[in-house]
């Protein structure tokens, strides 16, 4: 299977107790596949865990280390950021969603798993957005 990119919401479901079925699917994507995330995703995950999930810094650090052992964590370049600005303008994405999309494209990921973006949307004829929680 090809590498795939995970949006922040996938990691959030894996570490929250709110929806067990989504947590199971998220954990499978994180720990059983060939996933990539960016430092941006780690930063967003950290912020949500601290502010919304009310986890303490030690638990968040443990989660980040666990994730980083299972998933390739990458940075992004200025070129990626500039491409994100174009994507944001051309597709009406928020800048931060466009940055995740741009990073996935730069790393030749054919799939971006996200609950927050349009399911089955294709970007630049190379990247499909897939909501892993769509059943049936």
Residue ranges and their predicted role:
Residues 1-37, 52-59, 135:
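Short, well-structured N-terminal submotif of metal-dependent ribonuclease cores
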Residues 3, 102-136:
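Acidic, PIN/NYN-like endoribonuclease modules and their adjacent C-terminal/linker elements
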Residues 7-9, 44, 97, 116:
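Acidic active-site catalytic centers that drive phospho-/nucleotidyl reactions
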Residues 39-42:
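Short acidic alpha-helix initiation/capping motifs at coil-to-helix transition points
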Residues 44-72:
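Active-site-proximal, substrate-binding regions of enzyme catalytic domains
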Residues 72-115:
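Active-site neighborhoods of divalent-metal-dependent phosphate/nucleic-acid chemistry enzymes
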């Amino acid at each position: 299977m090809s590498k795939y990119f995970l949006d922040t919401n996938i990691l959030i479901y894996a570490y929250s107790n709110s929806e067990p079925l989504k947590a199971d699917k998220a954990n499978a994507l994180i720990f059983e596949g060939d996933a990539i995330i960016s430092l941006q995703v780690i930063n967003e995950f950290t912020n949500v865990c601290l502010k919304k999930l009310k986890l303490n810094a030690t638990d968040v650090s443990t989660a980040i280390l666990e994730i980083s052992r299972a998933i390739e964590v990458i940075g992004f370049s200025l070129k990626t950021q500039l491409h994100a600005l174009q994507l944001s303008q051309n597709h009406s994405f928020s800048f931060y969603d466009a940055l995740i999309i741009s990073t996935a494209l730069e790393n030749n990921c054919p799939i971006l798993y996200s609950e927050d973006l349009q399911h089955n949307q294709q970007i630049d004829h190379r990247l499909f957005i897939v909501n892993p929680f769509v059943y049936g």
